[in-house]
Amino acid sequence: MKYRRARFTAVAAVLALVAAGCSLEQAASRDTVKVVVGYQSKTINTVTAGTLLRAKGFLEQRLSKLTADGGKKYQVEWQDYDTGAPITAQMVAEKIDIGSMGDYPLLINGSRTQANERSRTEFVSVTGYQPRGSLNMIVVNRDSPVQSLHDLAGKKVSSSVGSASDGLLRQALSRGGIDPKSGVEVLNQQPQIGASALESGQVQALSQFVAWPGLLVFQDKAELLFDGAELNVPTFHGVVARRDYSNQHPEVLDAFIQAQLDATDFLHQRPLEAAKLVADGSGLPQEVVYLYNGPGGTSFDTPLKPQLIQAFKGDVPYLKSIGDFADLDIDGFVNDAPLRKAFADRGLDYNAAVGNFANPAPISGTDPVANRPVTDAALASEVWLDGQDTAQPAADPTALLRAVKQARAQGKKVRAAYVPDAELGTRWFADKALWVRAGDTYLPFTTPAAAQRYLTAHPGGTQLSYEQAVGEVRS
């Protein structure tokens, strides 16, 4: 009996300790607010709400300050995905609180979460946008016989259905006189699967969002067929938050938006360092990250501008055409109140920012080769010399060629060079562009079609390679 009683006493003591531990854990859990953030490390125009934000720890710093000021404790969980679709699925399941994605997925997110008040989301900020639409592109294999949209008829094309890149494909095909439903065979694939399919020849083209087109071209695995800027429709990425979560924890959403603004400021002020952090966090080459996220590229600008919301509304017919898309009150889905508050808290004029559609971080400075200031954002270019912490500005593409020529003559290595397309303005790799000489001026183009349009209008122009242009430009 003594043995049985002793054993019972020991078990009871253990149970009491376990119960005490559970109650302490529950109490600790009640004192800790968890925020789950869904992001896409390789979709680099969301970096100010994802990869860069995480790398710099701005959100954790903002939340820690709330705790230090007498608030609750906070725990941030980051979840990385390849596309916006799984982020939306997790928000529907109430497992992600704040997420970032492209314009088409944002609409799908709002549509699919609206049936449940606990999962219902709102669009609270923009991460980055491109006024003409160059965030989506179509690429083909190098030396592909496909040289125009017309050549895609009857071919297999990889894209991610429901994404902005698929919307681009359908609009581009329609504009090229090809029925997007029957004129090509579209394979619904994740970006990395589509990239492999293109490389292996299983598909003849890939329509995708950044950074995939630039990555494949940089790796010499593809060349650009169609620049989304030809559609001249803004494309953007942004942030959605679950309303129920935001209502329960408004201080968390406020901290997130302030942290996004911190990340945006950091990217503008230290673009090459930001590109390095994003490259480390995403596995992308730094040169590719800087193509899109460097000065004169994507506009990293948070306000919910009317031009973007109008483009948003124009995306709805496409989403309805592909199937399951419940009507969404877009004006009700968009909520700029938290962002307005964040701007006011920083002493910034939100209305002025909304009204400004210019890139907030253009290429600037003095061209050291031409010895003149860089004043025309539409022509401004950059040379990134190996070992430099900042890129060297060039007043225009011709000046950039001179800078490259001079650097080579001095034994310096050019890590990357960036120029704006002469027709569309798209920031692109100088050594991957198609060049045309017009007198003493050299013009870069992203696609064969763009170069041909110029040559047709200007018969005196001469097409040449990048190396030819560097070799013959006057120093």
Model-predicted segments: where are they?
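Short, glycine-/small- and polar/acidic-enriched structural segments
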Residues: S29-D179, E185-N188, Q204, V233
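C-terminal motif of bacterial Sec signal peptides marking the signal peptidase cleavage site
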Residues: L15-G21
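A bilobed periplasmic-binding-protein/Venus flytrap-type ligand-binding module shared by bacterial periplasmic
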Residues: L135-P145, T235-E251, V436-A438
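Pocket-lining segment of extracytoplasmic ligand-binding domains
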Residues: Q114, Q192-G281, T398, Q406-G425
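Short cysteine-rich clusters marking metal-coordination/redox-active sites
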Residues: D367-R372
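Bacterial signal peptide processing site
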Residues: S23-Q26
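Secondary-structure end/capping motifs
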Residues: I44, H249-A326
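Conserved C-terminal helix/tail region of periplasmic/extracytoplasmic solute-binding proteins
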Residues: K320-G365
